[in-house]
Amino acid sequence: MLDLLLMISGLILLIVGGNWLLKGAVDLSFRLNIPKIVVGMTVVSFVTSAPELVVSAQSAFKGYPDLALSNVVGSNMANLGLVLGITLLIGRLDVRRSFYFTDWPVMMAASLLFFSFIYLDKYLGRTEGVIMVVSLFVFIIYLLRFQKPAVVEELPEFVNLLPIHNTVFYLGLGAVALWGGAELLISGAVNLANLFNVSERLVGISIVSVGTSIPEMAASVVAMVRKEKAISVGNLIGSNIFNLLAVMGITAIIQPIEVLDQRLLQHDIFWMLGISFLILPLVFFPSRQRLGWKEGLILLAVYAFFLISTFK
């Protein structure tokens, strides 16, 4: 019971800390006169992936590499299967042109790059981490050069400058909350795995990854209910790209990762590749450039089968 309470407390701190850090980071960026296009693509995207980054980096550093990997793989599965699936049950989404030419191809390329690095030698080292981070910067430069309208749409609504002391407060408290939340979450997850005699991978792929995906789920559902334009398939795909290239890349640079539980390579990573590929035919059939409740049910079913097969 205490371990579960630790995990829940950690998740709450991660979510709250992530929001505080985002507010402070965006406000500071505007104070420094950084162009909105750069803020939208770099600051916002990076900070919204901060919970996954902190959890994975601390897990690897503490000697729990499977928890670090399963958090990212599971989070990517949850973004497309759970978050997008639930969102589509609430309303319909029109797919933007950038999905075909940028979002989906880059997500698949990042997924295959990650797969090729870790599948062959069951190890993600600093060299691979540097390559992944450099690939992310190349992607960002491409977006800034050719996809400016799409990036501007991703900017947060709060752009009014805060008093400077509030900015510092949000930045400091957000960073502390993220660190503390990750500590509690990792401690609770490892203890829970030991208590029920299950692998760290199982806890990471299910509870931890879903927990770190809660901000995306909350934002997507609220935006859909309010009929706002802020939510798109591109938002979730962008989150997956950052998870793979930024979270895994930076984590590997800080602490190289060795796969201990082979089911990550024999099972989980193939499901991640599969659901990433599945998005493309779902967009085209039965109604082109549109996703509705039927596609949402398919994605939720795929995610449910993934979880069932994971615990077998």
Language-model features: locations:
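Hydrophobic alpha-helical segments, chiefly the membrane-spanning helices
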Residues: 1-312
